[in-house]
């Protein structure tokens, strides 16, 4: 869900569940056992507002970061060349609570929509999810992050 490695492996992006904020932490600090919690925390950056609530994150080899946005049935992209600006990659009423993202070698971004808001816990005991669940894809002409 809300975790993605940067294209060069130097930053790990994350967001709290259903958060509107994006954060990153230095990966070198995460693997350095000599650092205490405060030293690791000192490498955390607030990357700003994600343009909406959601917790699915992904990144591509070009350095772009993708985030789900359940409020607008959408996936957003923070382009590496626009210094933090977010744009809509896809918005579709069928993307009911987009959740997990994956950039694939075929140039597509794959998206699951889990219909979380339709679960019985949120609908007075009535499960309103529609099955079978759907895996969506949209062409982004990007490649996945490959670190080794």
Regions found by a protein language model. Name each.
Residues 1-29:
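Beta-propeller domains
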Residues 1-11, 46-64, 93-106:
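Beta-rich, blade/repeat-based domains predominating
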Residues 6-7, 12-17, 59-60, 65-70, ...:
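Conserved beta-strand positions in repeat-built beta-propeller and related beta-rich domains
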Residues 20-22, 73-75, 118-119, 135:
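Structural signal for beta-propeller blades
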Residues 24-37, 79-82, 140-144:
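Short loop/turn segments immediately following beta-strands, especially the blade-tip
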Residues 39-49, 86-90:
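A short beta-strand motif characteristic of beta-propeller blades
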Residues 71, 85-96, 102-103, 114-116, ...:
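Beta-propeller domains with acidic blade repeats across secreted/periplasmic ectodomains
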Residues 102-148:
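Blade-level signature of beta-propeller repeat domains, shared across WD40, Kelch, NHL, RCC1
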């Amino acid at each position: 869900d809300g975790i993605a490695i940067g294209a060069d492996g130097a930053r790990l992006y994350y967001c709290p569940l259903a958060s509107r904020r994006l954060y990153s932490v230095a990966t070198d600090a995460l693997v350095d056992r000599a650092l205490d919690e405060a030293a690791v925390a000192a490498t955390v950056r607030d990357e700003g507002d994600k343009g909406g609530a959601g917790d699915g994150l992904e990144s591509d080899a070009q350095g772009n970061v993708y985030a789900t946005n359940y409020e607008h049935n959408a996936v957003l992209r923070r382009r590496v060349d626009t210094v933090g600006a977010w744009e809509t990659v896809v918005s579709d009423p069928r993307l009911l609570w987009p959740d997990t993202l994956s950039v694939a070698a075929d140039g597509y971004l794959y998206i699951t929509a889990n219909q979380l808001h339709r679960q019985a816990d949120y609908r007075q005991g009535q499960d309103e999810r529609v099955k079978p669940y759907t895996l969506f894809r949209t062409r982004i002409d990007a490649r996945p992050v490959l670190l080794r």
